[in-house]
Amino acid sequence: MNAVALIQRQLDAYNARDLDSFVACYAEDCVLAALNGPVAETGREALRVRYARTFAENPDNRTTLLGRIQLGDIVVDHEDVTRGPGRERFQVLAIYTVKNGEIARVDFAK
């Protein structure tokens, strides 16, 4: 699967709040971090815990893709995230690094 297809698959799983399919897109030793900042999570199990909480606390959570660019194994998404009616809404850049058909790292800017 190419990098763009993988990122789309994880975005679709995120929007469906399908935790197993979402986590399956990530490498066992994946890293989530703030762009030019601290690492937020390391490893698939930490990712599972984080997003299980996110999905439980935000049942109407939805991300809309505003734009996407790719350069090799790097995919950058511009996303609009809505937590639900009357809840927090924000835009984010998600910079995905894909290795061996899995997401190895995501750096977020918001």
Q: For each predicted feature, which ranges?
A:
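Short, well-ordered alpha-helical segments enriched in acidic and aromatic residues
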Residues: 16-31
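A beta-strand edge to alpha-helix "cap/lid" segment located at domain peripheries
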Residues: 2, 15, 33, 39-41, ...
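Short, aromatic-enriched amphipathic alpha-helices that serve as compact interaction elements
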Residues: 1-17
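Alpha-helical elements of Rossmann-like donor-binding domains used by nucleotide-donor carbohydrate transfer enzymes
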Residues: 9, 21, 46-50
